Amino acid sequence: LMSRFGVVDVPTGLDGFSGRHRAYVKVQDGCLLRCSYCIIPHVRPKLTSRPLEHIIDEVRRLTDAGHREVVLTGIHLGHYGVDWNRNKPREQWTRLSDLVRHLCELPGDFRIRLSSIEATEVTRSLIAAMTEYPDRLVPHVHLCLQSGSDSVLRRMRRRWGTRMFLDRCRLL
């Protein structure tokens, strides 16, 4: 959004959340979806994931500053890496679970938490990462549910219905 107004010198992250236990790291921005009610595709930039190295550097700065929990955030967190996956074979895709694994391997006494995520992005790979790092990755998942009615979800142009939502909850 800032680039639309000629602002190109945008900070890559925050150095601290002074006096706070929890810090927030935005790992992606934008959204590919066009839900009927949503203005985000019109006011946010196209889907863009931050480079892994930048995120790792920011997490290190924050944990070195004493933050004990880092919350990964994004407009559509589950789409982290999707912008890099075009024209790549599926086995070479970058996913949110890859980012989580890299961050969980960093040294230090801190935990990783995921902010809100879509039910369709609760993948077996993400669940496996949660299982692999139970002491590092907070066992908390905030799934978005705008309606419990399939007809309302269709009118909203959501990519899933109540059955898929419940199936993903059962996976957890």
State the predicted function of each range:
Residues 1-83, 163-171:
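Proteins enriched for Cys/Gly/acidic motifs involved in redox and nucleic-acid/cofactor modification
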Residues 64-172:
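Conserved SAM/AdoMet-binding glycine-rich loop
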